[in-house]
Amino acid sequence: MQFRFVYVGTQVRDLDRSIAFYRDLLGMEVGPREKVAETGGEWAELRTPGSDLLLELNWYPEGTRFFKGPYRHGDELDHLAFDCEDADAAYRELVAKGARPGLPPFTESTSRLAYVVDPDGVWIELSSKAR
């Protein structure tokens, strides 16, 4: 049997706030958004133009068995990586738009990397070719 990686699902505390972060700061397109009767929660699917990989944001109400509490600020998920043309410029742009700084740009091997942090504490890697 063969498997194909399809998406990453991460739990968020405020679905609207997280959608706004990924849409407005990272340019992701918002796809389906649905309530789930079985969990009491709601999810939204996002993707970047030109990519088949999906990001699923999941929100569950406190008091349900699906809610993770106390919330650990993204500790369960290490980071999400986005390729870009210029990691330095992307970092400056996202911080100027309100993203929390993670690590300022640095060079690692043949890549230029920088990190910002989303509203739920998940680190976002910005990666470009080193100059």
Protein language model features and the residues they cover:
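Vicinal oxygen chelate
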Residues: 1, 31, 42-45, 82, ...
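N-terminal beta-strand motif that seeds the catalytic metal site of vicinal oxygen chelate
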Residues: 1-17, 77-82, 127-131
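Core segments of cupin and vicinal oxygen chelate
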Residues: 9-54, 96
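Short amphipathic alpha-helices within nucleic acid-binding modules
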Residues: 21, 88-93
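Short, P/G- and charge-enriched loop/turn segments at secondary-structure junctions
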Residues: 32, 66-70
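Short, charged/polar surface micro-motifs in flexible loops or helix N-caps
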Residues: 50-54, 62-64, 87-88
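Acetyl-CoA-dependent GNAT
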Residues: 59-64, 128-131
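Short glycine/proline- and charge-enriched loop/turn segments
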Residues: 71-75
